[in-house]
């Protein structure tokens, strides 16, 4: 299901009971409340230059990283497999973890750190998605960055009947949905002449795997170390365990537990920002729930634009203060890049004029301005420019280094702050040297 709008992505349903209809009307009412509370819906269509990161180079410098992606609605043409109603302009979100792998013999979505050497980590990761179809899991996992985003398409190949079928066949061979059960209400929409397994993979393509076949995406990377990736893996496995054991049944909810809650809270587990609780009272959740495109902007700002030159501002940010004192880490750091990719073209299966909205205040809102800035200023999308920017920021901080005249905890914070900045300055300068060396070798 696509976030925000709550529009289903299954076949047209048979007649429902009065009880089910009333339940759906209540769900619709909750969504209307949310829309009223967040009145501005802006920038529906893809408006960003296509950007790409050199995966081999990036992973050689940052073998462990998380990548949050806000992805558009999809619009499937009729006559190709199951006729799906489609999502809505609120879109969907997915989460890629480089350096984490699916445990292949678990028979259920379970993660572990990859065994690969950090030097061979390019594309070695797992993509996660949340879907309202699921009954016994919160998320599913797709092995490999290339397949998670691009399916089984060859370089330069469009989406056609052959590549569409090939991608589903490969997904089945990988066992992406092994051990996963769908809600009966979803399975009841299955065409009579289709097996449940084929149906599950058909309605999951371009939402839970092979995202680029049908959707535009805007992605934000968060460099991590092995320890932080391990924390995220443990968090995600623990999140799924009650559904795996049968203690709980998963029920997606646009306001209280949508696709973006998973990614937000996984990043909160390592200190990127505050946790966003699930299952809050509806009147509270309706005015504060994650919207995929908003989350993309929020994450890019958190990892690039915190006032790191102002230690007092960092001290007043509780999450940043705790991160720095306990971990020696500031979430705004080098290497946190954005990437924009439109849906694959040519495309015989899906229309590619797609929407993905912000929710924002219509007069005083700033999301559009902030989004535009990300794709105008090279430091957000180009690795060398990003690293040079942080090197300059760190140099300026250290040049003005002055400890406050205090003996309280703020003084301890200041000392830790300058130590961290000095360490990060040395690291980013070393990374720039490695990047320059890599570019020189590539040019030969």
Listing of model-derived features with the role each one plays in the protein:
Residues 44-168:
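Intrinsically disordered, low-complexity N-terminal segments that are enriched in acidic
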Residues 34, 87, 256-259:
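Active-site-proximal structural scaffolding
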């Amino acid at each position: 299901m696509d976030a925000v709008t709550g529009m289903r992505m299954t076949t047209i349903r048979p007649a429902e009971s009065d009880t089910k209809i009333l339940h759906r009307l209540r769900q619709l009412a909750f969504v209307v409340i949310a829309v009223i509370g967040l009145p501005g819906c802006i920038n529906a269509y893809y408006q960003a230059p296509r950007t790409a990161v050199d995966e081999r180079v990036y992973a050689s410098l940052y073998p462990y990283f998380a990548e949050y992606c806000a992805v558009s609605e999809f619009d499937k043409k009729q006559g190709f497999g199951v006729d799906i109603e489609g999502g809505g302009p609120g879109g969907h979100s997915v989460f890629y973890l480089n350096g984490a792998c699916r445990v292949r013999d678990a028979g259920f979505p379970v993660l572990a750190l990859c065994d690969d050497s950090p030097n061979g980590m390019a594309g070695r990761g797992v993509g996660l998605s949340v879907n309202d179809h699921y009954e016994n899991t919160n998320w599913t996992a797709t092995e490999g960055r290339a397949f998670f985003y691009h399916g089984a398409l060859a370089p330069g190949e469009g989406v056609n009947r052959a590549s569409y079928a090939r991608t589903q066949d490969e997904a089945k061979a990988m066992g992406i949905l092994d051990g996963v059960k769908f809600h009966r209400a979803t399975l009841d929409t299955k065409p009579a002449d289709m097996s449940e397994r084929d149906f599950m993979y058909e309605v999951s393509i371009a939402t839970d795997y092979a995202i680029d076949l049908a959707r535009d995406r805007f992605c934000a990377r968060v460099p991590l170390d092995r320890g932080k990736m391990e924390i995220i893996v443990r968090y995600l496995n623990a999140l799924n365990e009650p559904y795996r054991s049968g203690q709980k049944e998963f029920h997606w909810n646009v306001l209280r537990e949508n696709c973006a809650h998973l990614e937000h809270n996984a990043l909160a587990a390592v200190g990127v920002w505050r946790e966003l609780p699930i299952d809050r009272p509806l009147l509270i959740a309706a005015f504060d729930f994650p919207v995929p495109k908003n989350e993309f902007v929020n994450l890019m700002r958190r990892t690039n634009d915190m006032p790191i030159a102002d230690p007092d501002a960092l001290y007043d940010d509780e999450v940043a203060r705790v991160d720095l004192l306990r971990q020696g880490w500031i979430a705004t750091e080098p290497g946190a890049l954005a990437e924009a990719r439109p849906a694959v073209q040519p495309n015989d299966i899906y229309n590619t004029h797609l929407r993905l909205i912000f929710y924002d205040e219509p007069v005083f809102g700033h999301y559009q301005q902030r989004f535009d800035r990300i794709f105008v200023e090279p430091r957000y999308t180009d690795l060398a420019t990003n690293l040079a920017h942080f090197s300059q920021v760190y140099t300026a901080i250290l040049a003005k280094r002055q400890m406050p005249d205090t003996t309280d905890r703020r003084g301890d914070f200041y000392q830790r702050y300058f130590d961290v900045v000095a360490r990060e300055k040395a690291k980013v300068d070393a990374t720039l040297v490695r990047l320059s060396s890599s570019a020189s070798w590539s040019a030969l």
